[in-house]
Amino acid sequence: MKSSHAYLVCILLLSLFSLHQCVRLERSNKIDMSVCVHEICGGVFDGGCYCCPKTPALCWADIQFCTTYCQSQT
């Protein structure tokens, strides 16, 4: 009976350690969604354009204007 208790405690500790590692990994992998994404756009924007990730239909040729607009949307 004691060996089964030790086995369950061991499984619990391994599970808690795995969960702790996942939380640490998740915190370090946060993506900053306020930064504009460089896209290839045709027509007016020959060198490409910058779009907000949340609204990909709105794109601008100037990265500074896009960054200002994307930050105001959050």
Curated annotation (Swiss-Prot):
Keyword vocabulary terms for this entry: Disulfide bond, Signal
Which family does the UniProt entry place this protein in? Belongs to the MEG family.
- What gene name is listed for this protein? ESFL4
Name the chain's protein. Answer: EMBRYO SURROUNDING FACTOR 1-like protein 4
Q: In which tissues is it expressed?
A: expressed in flowers.
Enumerate the InterPro entries for this protein: ESF1_brassicaceae (IPR041608)
Q: Could you provide one GO biological process annotation from this protein's UniProt record? A: suspensor development
Q: Which residues form the signal peptide?
A: 1-22
Pfam families listed in its UniProt record: ESF1
Q: Which pairs of Cys residues are joined through disulfide bonds in the record? A: 36-51, 41-70, 49-66, 52-59
